[in-house]
A protein has these predicted regions:
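All-alpha effector-binding/dimerization core of bacterial HTH-type transcriptional repressors
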Residues: 39-200
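N-terminal helix-turn-helix
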Residues: 1-37
Length: 200
């Protein structure tokens, strides 16, 4: 009634408009409660290209954010040593961050780099684009191989993301290469599925 009177259109027209917006994902209905505006989803393509979280948010007019939860040098696994062609005594730099869109946590991000990337210790990695920082050091990320599966949030992951334990997450694991086809880092992302719209 209110929309019909405000815009001087028939109820049928209003119902059709609301149905159309619901189909497009802009609105959602709750039985017995009404129609509500849907939360904006971050669009990301599942390709072998490399697109930063920051750029994805900017494309959606969302404000990107990041908070470091861990940065340390650790011993690599045998698989990591082999993938990144590491020397026997070489460490890896482990960087864990929570990623935010418009101030809300939407993704956990784990990156592993060769020890030569230790310059990251002196960079401000909170609310910053990692890819832009790497570019500043003449490291241009170019392509990746990705694997995807569904996992369920541990209590620690759930607490970081503000969701319930056991909540389904999309896990994306990537092997990322630079323009010279050298592996720069291994990346694991745990995404809250209903915060993203994936394009294949």
């Amino acid at each position: 009634n209110e929309l019909s009177e405000t815009y001087n259109v028939s109820r049928v027209t209003v119902r059709k408009a609301l149905a159309g917006l619901s189909e497009l994902g802009y609105l959602y209905r709750k039985s017995g409660k009404g129609t509500f505006v849907a939360e904006k989803k971050i669009q990301r393509g599942i390709t072998n290209g490399v697109l930063s979280f920051t750029d994805m948010c900017r494309m959606m007019n969302a404000s990107p954010g990041a908070k470091i939860t861990k940065i340390a040098l650790e011993d690599p696994t045998e698989k990591e040593m082999e993938l990144m062609s590491l020397d026997k005594d070489e460490k890896i730099l482990v960087l864990e961050r929570i990623r935010y869109a418009d101030g809300k946590p939407v993704q956990l991000e784990l990156n592993k780099f060769p020890e030569s990337f230790s310059f990251l210790f002196s960079e401000n990695l909170n609310d910053s684009s990692l890819y832009e920082i790497l570019k500043k050091h003449n490291i241009i990320l170019d392509h990746s191989q990705k694997t995807l599966d569904i996992v369920f949030a541990t209590s620690k992951e759930a607490k970081a993301l503000g969701i319930s334990s056991g909540y389904p997450l999309l896990r994306i694991e990537s092997v990322i290469h630079d323009v010279d086809n050298t592996i720069t880092n291994l990346c694991r992302q745990l995404c809250i599925g209903d915060k993203f719209k994936f394009i294949i």
